[in-house]
C-alpha cells in the first residue's frame, strides 16, 4: 500500500545552498521532517548547477515523517534577467524606458531549457509565454 501523503511544501532554494535556516527549516519542521537529511540530499542533487541559481522544489511529506522531492528548472524571470544582463526588472512597466532587451534566439534557447516545466504544447507556445514575461518585466523583444 502507498504511503499516506500529509502535504506538499513548495520552496525556492538557491542551488547547493540549502541550510536549516528559514525558509527551509521552519517549513520542514512544521511537518516533522528531517531538515538536515533534506539539505544534504538537495545540495547533492544541485551541486552540478550554477551556485545560487534559484531552484523551485516540491517536497512531498508522508505520514511516517519521510519525504520525497522534485526539483524543477529555475523561474523564467531568472533566465530572462540573465539573458538581458540586468539585476532586476522594471518597477514601472510600460511607463518608463525599457530596462533591457532580449532576442528571439535567446527566448527560443530559454524555451528549449524550460520546455518540460512550462504548460505549453510546443516550443513556439513556450516562446510566446516568455515574450509575455519579458514584456511584463520591462524588457523589449528584438528579432535576431
UniProtKB/Swiss-Prot annotation:
<dbReference type="GO" id="GO:0070180">
    <property type="term" value="F:large ribosomal subunit rRNA binding"/>
</dbReference>
<dbReference type="InterPro" id="IPR020783">
    <property type="entry name" value="Ribosomal_uL11_C"/>
</dbReference>
<dbReference type="GO" id="GO:0022625">
    <property type="term" value="C:cytosolic large ribosomal subunit"/>
</dbReference>
<keyword id="KW-0488">Methylation</keyword>
<dbReference type="Pfam" id="PF00298">
    <property type="entry name" value="Ribosomal_L11"/>
</dbReference>
<keyword id="KW-0689">Ribosomal protein</keyword>
<dbReference type="GO" id="GO:0003735">
    <property type="term" value="F:structural constituent of ribosome"/>
</dbReference>
<comment type="subunit">
    <text>Part of the ribosomal stalk of the 50S ribosomal subunit. Interacts with L10 and the large rRNA to form the base of the stalk. L10 forms an elongated spine to which L12 dimers bind in a sequential fashion forming a multimeric L10(L12)X complex.</text>
</comment>
<dbReference type="GO" id="GO:0006412">
    <property type="term" value="P:translation"/>
</dbReference>
<dbReference type="InterPro" id="IPR020784">
    <property type="entry name" value="Ribosomal_uL11_N"/>
</dbReference>
<keyword id="KW-0699">rRNA-binding</keyword>
<protein>
    <recommendedName>
        <fullName>Large ribosomal subunit protein uL11</fullName>
    </recommendedName>
</protein>
<comment type="function">
    <text>Forms part of the ribosomal stalk which helps the ribosome interact with GTP-bound translation factors.</text>
</comment>
<dbReference type="InterPro" id="IPR036796">
    <property type="entry name" value="Ribosomal_uL11_N_sf"/>
</dbReference>
<dbReference type="InterPro" id="IPR000911">
    <property type="entry name" value="Ribosomal_uL11"/>
</dbReference>
<dbReference type="InterPro" id="IPR020785">
    <property type="entry name" value="Ribosomal_uL11_CS"/>
</dbReference>
<comment type="similarity">
    <text>Belongs to the universal ribosomal protein uL11 family.</text>
</comment>
<dbReference type="InterPro" id="IPR006519">
    <property type="entry name" value="Ribosomal_uL11_bac-typ"/>
</dbReference>
<dbReference type="Pfam" id="PF03946">
    <property type="entry name" value="Ribosomal_L11_N"/>
</dbReference>
<keyword id="KW-0687">Ribonucleoprotein</keyword>
<keyword id="KW-0694">RNA-binding</keyword>
<dbReference type="InterPro" id="IPR036769">
    <property type="entry name" value="Ribosomal_uL11_C_sf"/>
</dbReference>
Amino acid at each position: 500500500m502507498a504511503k499516506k501523503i500529509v502535504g506538499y511544501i513548495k520552496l525556492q532554494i538557491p542551488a547547493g545552498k540549502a541550510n536549516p535556516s528559514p525558509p527551509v527549516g521552519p517549513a520542514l519542521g512544521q511537518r516533522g521532517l528531517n531538515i538536515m537529511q533534506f539539505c544534504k540530499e538537495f545540495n547533492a542533487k544541485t551541486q552540478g548547477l550554477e551556485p545560487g541559481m534559484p531552484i523551485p522544489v516540491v517536497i512531498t511529506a508522508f505520514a511516517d515523517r519521510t519525504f520525497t522531492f522534485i526539483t524543477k528548472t529555475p523561474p523564467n524571470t531568472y533566465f530572462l534577467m540573465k539573458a538581458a544582463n540586468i539585476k532586476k526588472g522594471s518597477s514601472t512597466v510600460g511607463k518608463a524606458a525599457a530596462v533591457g532587451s532580449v532576442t528571439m534566439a535567446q527566448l527560443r534557447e530559454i524555451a528549449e531549457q524550460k520546455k518540460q516545466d512550462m504548460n505549453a504544447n510546443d516550443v513556439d507556445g513556450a516562446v510566446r509565454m516568455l515574450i509575455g514575461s519579458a514584456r511584463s518585466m520591462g524588457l523589449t523583444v528584438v528579432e535576431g
